[in-house]
Each structure stands twice: as structure tokens, then as C-alpha cells.
């Protein structure tokens, strides 16, 4: 049993009562947990109080910084390391053990982490595993700034990734991403994301910046009808999504639909611009 892991966990939330309790329960060994709330109207604040963790309310003014960067700039952390975690992301014992070991002796200033997705009630071992950079040293950087106009209603960094100065490592033990809110919520959420992505691409087509290799490939193809089918083949065939049965097929199909929506919305934006 590992106790007092010297990492500050930050959980940005809004109305996450269904998953927040389980998420916090699994973080017992962490030295500090801070929940940053966008004025939830459900029982989320009471759940944070029950677990005796720090509660911070965030009110977005529509400008930079958004929630994660605002927290990095305005909330004092007890520890050298910060881990950003969503309320539907659950740490495992293996992850906690590996985390405690790697941060105790490393020259890295951040770590990539793999995520296993649960989709339609099934924990997906194949397909296209999610990978993020949510763990880094405080002061080593922050989430990228992406200029936005009125088309963005997101108060938190969703598409933005941390820009860090230093070596980046890898933690092999995954975090479990378990979304309990069903397909309707999944489709609505990705509809919002595709709108954001289309507008952002049209506003600023030079995405070379400090992108990962995968992101550079994505933005070279995103203005093409081919990206959706290519991504389906990548998820379902090359990454073994077919081994997951109907859930693997649906997962890959929804990913294909997402990129179709981005391209279709790009065409709509251009049509509207031509008529102005």
C-alpha cells in the first residue's frame, strides 16, 4: 500500500456527481486533491466535502485563461508534481505504484499516460487507445493558448495540450476512462468538439507549432473526406478494434463520423463566408 504520493491531483468538474465519488475514492493515497468546479448544480460540492478534499469554484469570463491554466496560475499547490484528471478517469493500483516510483527518480518534467476507454459498458483493450500529457512539474509550462472567438463555449482546455520545456517520459500503466452518461451524451459532446475543431482549423490553418507527430498528420488530413475512413481502418483493423466485437465496430464508426462532421462543418463555414 502506497501512502502520501507527493502529487497534487486537479479535477476540473461541472455536475459530475455520478462519477466524482468513485474518482475521489481511488485517490486516497495522494497527498493533495483539488476539485475545480464550474458552479455545479448537482451534489458534486457535497461529494468533495465528504472526502475532505479542497474545493475551488471557477467562473469563466469568456477570455483566457480557461479552467486548467487558471488553476495553474491562481491556485497554490503543495507538491512539485500536478496530475490533471477528469471525474470519469479512474486510477488503478498499478498506475499509482508506477507513478510513485517514476517521479521519485527522474530527469523528466512530464509524462505521457495511456488511457483505456470503456465504451458501451465494455473496457476496450484494442482499437485506438487514448494518450494524454496530464502529469508534469509545476512551473514547467501550461496548456497552449488558442485564440478563439464567439464560436467557442468551452470553459476548459479540451483540444489544447500542455507545452512543456524539458524531457517527457512515459507511464505504461493506464488510467481507466469510464463514461457513464451513455451514447446520447457521447454524441452531443463530440458534436460540440467537431464544431470547435472546424472553426479553429478555418481560423488558423497553420498548425505546425508544437504539435505531436500524430497531431501533425491529423491536421494535414482533416480538410479531406478521406480522414474518416482512414481513421476507421486504423482503429478497427490495424489497432485490432475488430477483436472487441460490435463495441469495437461502433467505436471506430463513431470516430469516422467525427471526422466526417468536422469536414462537413468546414464546408458549411466556407459557404457561409462566401455569402457574406
Where are these regions (language model features)?
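Active-site nucleotide-sugar/metal-binding loop of Leloir-type enzymes
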Residues: 69-81
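Short, well-formed alpha-helical segments that are part of the catalytic scaffolds
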Residues: 10-29
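Short, structured coil segments at secondary-structure junctions
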Residues: 29, 50-52, 164
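Catalytic-site signature of metal-activated, phosphate-bearing donor transferases
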Residues: 65-66, 72, 92-273
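Short, acidic/glycine-rich phosphate-metal binding loop used to engage nucleotide
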Residues: 57-64
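A conserved acidic beta->alpha catalytic loop
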Residues: 26, 37-47, 60, 86
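Acidic helix N-cap motif at the loop->helix transition within catalytic regions
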Residues: 18-22, 42-51, 94-95
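Cell-envelope/extracellular polymer assembly enzymes that use nucleotide-activated donors
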Residues: 6-8
Amino acid at each position: 500500500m502506497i501512502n502520501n504520493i507527493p502529487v497534487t491531483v486537479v479535477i476540473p468538474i461541472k455536475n459530475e456527481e455520478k462519477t466524482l465519488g468513485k474518482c475521489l475514492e481511488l485517490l486516497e493515497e495522494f497527498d493533495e486533491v483539488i476539485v475545480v468546479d464550474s458552479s455545479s448544480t448537482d451534489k458534486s460540492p457535497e461529494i468533495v466535502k465528504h472526502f475532505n478534499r479542497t474545493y475551488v469554484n471557477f467562473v469563466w469570463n469568456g477570455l483566457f485563461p480557461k479552467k486548467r491554466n487558471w488553476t495553474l496560475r491562481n491556485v497554490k499547490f503543495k507538491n512539485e508534481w500536478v496530475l490533471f484528471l477528469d471525474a470519469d478517469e479512474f486510477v488503478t493500483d498499478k498506475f499509482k505504484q508506477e507513478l510513485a516510483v517514476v517521479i521519485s527518480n527522474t530527469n523528466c518534467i512530464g509524462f505521457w499516460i495511456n488511457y483505456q476507454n470503456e465504451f458501451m459498458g465494455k473496457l476496450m483493450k484494442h482499437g485506438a487507445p487514448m494518450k494524454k500529457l496530464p502529469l508534469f512539474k509545476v512551473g514547467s509550462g501550461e496548456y497552449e493558448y488558442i485564440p478563439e472567438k464567439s464560436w467557442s463555449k468551452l470553459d476548459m482546455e479540451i483540444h489544447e495540450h500542455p507545452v512543456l520545456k524539458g524531457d517527457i517520459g512515459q507511464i505504461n500503466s493506464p488510467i481507466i476512462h469510464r463514461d457513464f452518461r451513455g451514447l446520447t451524451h457521447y454524441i452531443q459532446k463530440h458534436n460540440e468538439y467537431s464544431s470547435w475543431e472546424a472553426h479553429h482549423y478555418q481560423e488558423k490553418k497553420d498548425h505546425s507549432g508544437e504539435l505531436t507527430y500524430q497531431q501533425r498528420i491529423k491536421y494535414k488530413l482533416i480538410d479531406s473526406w478521406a480522414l474518416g475512413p482512414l481513421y476507421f481502418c486504423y482503429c478497427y483493423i490495424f489497432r485490432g478494434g475488430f477483436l472487441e466485437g460490435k463495441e469495437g465496430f461502433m467505436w471506430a464508426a463513431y470516430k469516422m463520423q467525427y471526422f466526417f462532421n468536422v469536414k462537413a462543418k468546414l464546408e458549411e463555414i466556407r459557404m457561409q463566408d462566401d455569402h457574406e
